């Protein structure tokens, strides 16, 4: 019996898994239904043995999870949950039932300019948001742009995406900090600088691909087409394309600035948003804060026990302590699926110091004031730091708390409370690291030698799902 005709099966008592929607290079995607709500979902199933056999596959899966965790936007397909058994990994994602934008173009040909503009506006909103989180898609094409039941665009397939984090968060420092060096994507949509394979700006490469998509929406075909690959590359390098006569003057002017071979001369995201053609009937999409995606559950009520007469009230005058388990798990990084089952509510950074907590706290406060941050003491070993200037999403606010592991060992934890997540990461790496290097013993994750580890501390009851393969 074909997999697409199999009866529904149950995954972890939470989802009914139904028909096969599609098959990729190393995954199968099924239609599913959340049992408690009846909501439709898409479930990507990956066999672990396929992951371990293929070099770089674990890294790719880890990257896709990390990327999609950062992105909560109405025009980006949402990753809802990650689960695993001994043999399989399951991505539970938003189900988008309107099909691919590619299918619409293939079926209907060119779109009316107003409809093409709407999809381009939503694409730019989504891609600009991704860039603000440090994510470059690198494979933007109509096949990776889906349409929902309301006719709105959704960006999907982050398997090739590059997550640009500062050093210590997965990125690397060097003379070409901001350049990517992996040739990804589909040739007809790929920017000239990517094809040259000499390093490129991921944001500008995505903008080129957005230009290709806009051309395809308006024309019904691609701007650069040739059966000979080398001839195709030559056309892309020179941006040799013709505009059909039905293109409006305004759309041609925008495309002429999008499809520029030199990325330094190519139009930027902020400039695109100022173009009158783009702004016509534009309604900005409202992104969701990553901190608001899943609220923290309320603490269960507990009975207050009577205090011993000799027991002191916790007035916050001394630092909280870390036990050994908390310390080890907090300072460890690497690919651990069990860490991916919970939505991370607050982006955190942490370092250890061989100085007493009191000394660390004083040094931290001095450094914050030198960085022109407002400092407010929440309690004796916890403070709130706030930038005086507005950032991309308001003023960056961070809490810093000092914990005592031993009399001469302290842990400092930074946690973003408001503002832009990428701005927060850059604050930790570019401002805090240099300012506190004299007291830091080790930053979280810096000592990990293996980028990929395995962990079987997950639900291993494979009998809960029998028919998905």
UniProtKB/Swiss-Prot annotation:
NAF domain location: 317-342
GO molecular function, one term: protein serine/threonine kinase activity
Superkingdom of source: Eukaryota
Catalytic activity as recorded in UniProt: L-seryl-[protein] + ATP = O-phospho-L-seryl-[protein] + ADP + H(+); L-threonyl-[protein] + ATP = O-phospho-L-threonyl-[protein] + ADP + H(+)
SUPFAM superfamilies noted in UniProt: Protein kinase-like (PK-like) (SSF56112)
Pfam families reported in the protein's UniProt record: NAF, Pkinase
Name by which UniProt lists this protein: CBL-interacting serine/threonine-protein kinase 16
Source organism phylogeny: Eukaryota, Viridiplantae, Streptophyta, Embryophyta, Tracheophyta
Name of the gene: CIPK16
């Amino acid at each position: 019996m074909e997999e697409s005709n199999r009866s529904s099966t149950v995954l972890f008592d939470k989802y009914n898994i139904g028909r096969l929607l599609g098959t990729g290079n190393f995954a199968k995607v099924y239609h599913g239904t959340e049992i408690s709500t009846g909501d439709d979902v898409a479930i990507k199933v990956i066999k672990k043995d396929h992951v371990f056999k293929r070099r770089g596959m674990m890294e790719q899966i880890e990257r896709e999870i990390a990327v999609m965790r950062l992105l909560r936007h109405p025009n980006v397909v949402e990753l809802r949950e990650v689960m695993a058994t001994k043999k399989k990994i399951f991505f539970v994602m938003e189900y988008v039932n309107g099909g691919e934008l590619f299918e619409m173009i293939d079926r209907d040909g060119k779109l009316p300019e107003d409809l093409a503009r709407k999809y381009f506006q939503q694409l730019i909103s989504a891609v600009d948001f991704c860039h603000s989180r440090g994510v470059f898609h690198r494979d933007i094409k109509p096949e990776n742009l889906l349409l929902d039941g309301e006719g709105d665009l959704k960006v999907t397939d982050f398997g090739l995406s590059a997550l640009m984090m500062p050093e210590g968060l997965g990125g690397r420092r060097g003379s070409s900090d901001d350049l990517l060096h992996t040739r990804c994507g589909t040739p007809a949509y790929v920017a000239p600088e990517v094809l040259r394979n000499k390093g490129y700006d991921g944001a500008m490469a995505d903008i080129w691909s957005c230009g290709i998509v806009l051309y395809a929406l308006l024309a019904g075909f691609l701007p650069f087409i040739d059966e000979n690959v080398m001839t195709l590359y030559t056309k892309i390098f020179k941006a040799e394309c013709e505009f059909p006569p039905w293109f409006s003057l305004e759309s041609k002017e925008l495309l002429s600035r999008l499809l520029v071979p030199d990325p330094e001369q190519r139009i930027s995201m902020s400039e695109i948003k100022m173009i009158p053609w783009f702004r016509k009937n534009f309604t900005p999409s409202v992104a969701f804060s990553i901190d608001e995606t899943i609220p923290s559950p309320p603490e269960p009520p507990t009975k207050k026990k009577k205090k011993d007469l000799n027991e002191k009230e916790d007035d916050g005058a001394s630092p909280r302590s870390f036990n050994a388990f908390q310390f080890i798990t907090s300072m460890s990084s690497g690919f651990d699926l069990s860490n991916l089952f919970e939505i991370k509510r607050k982006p955190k950074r942490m370092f250890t110091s061989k100085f007493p907590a009191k000394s660390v706290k004083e040094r931290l406060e001095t450094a914050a004031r030198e960085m022109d941050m407002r400092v407010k003491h929440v309690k004796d070993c916890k403070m709130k730091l706030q930038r005086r200037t507005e950032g991309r999403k308001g003023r960056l606010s961070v809490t810093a708390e000092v914990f005592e592991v031993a009399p001469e060992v302290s842990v400092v934890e930074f946690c973003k409370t408001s503002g832009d997540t990428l701005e927060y990461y850059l604050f930790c790496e570019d401002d805090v690291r240099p300012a506190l290097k004299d007291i830091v013993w080790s930053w979280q994750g810096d000592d990990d030698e293996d980028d990929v580890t395995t962990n079987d501390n997950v639900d291993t009851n494979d009998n809960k799902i029998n028919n998905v393969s």
